[in-house]
Amino acid sequence: MNQTLRTGVWIGALCVAWTLVMGFTGWYKDPALVNAFFLVILVEVALLAVGLRKTAATQGYGRQVLTGTLMAVVAAAIIFCGSLLFTTVAFPSYFQDVRAAQEEMLRAAGKTPAEIEAAVQAAAAGQTPLANALAGVAGTLVTGLLASLVIAAFHRKR
């Protein structure tokens, strides 16, 4: 397996694994711990740095950016599938749980029932398995491109 594919698979697998940790521990329901999910960004950036370091000897800046972006594409495909499985099979009540946690956070912030209802309704449109999976893909691709632009400046053939 080439380095691009290997790194992309590792990124995707570790991000899905962390998502499952968030699910099985129930952290996604806890307002104090829900942001721990964003550790996936650090995982992606760190593994992109490792992967691009391994391809740096033979590739210039542009090729390194392309390679890093392709690593993110591979990861995004795995994350898309993992996200769909997470919200439809492993945790089918995920969106109801997220709504309940959102309501709790808004109540704790002193919002009125009308404000809470408006916020929950506004968020509801994006709370579907497909929308959630596509958001994961978009986040992975954007992070991959931006991180690759920076990492390639330091790890490339000169």
Q: Residue locations for each model-derived region?
A:
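Transmembrane alpha-helical segments in integral membrane proteins
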Residues: 129-158
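Helix-loop junctions at the membrane-solvent interface of multi-pass transporters
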Residues: 24-29, 85-90, 154
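Functional transmembrane-helix hotspots
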Residues: 82-109
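Transmembrane alpha-helical insertion/packing segments
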Residues: 1-52
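Alpha-helical transmembrane segments of multipass membrane proteins
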Residues: 14-22, 44, 75-79, 83, ...
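Membrane-helix interface/capping segments
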Residues: 52-64
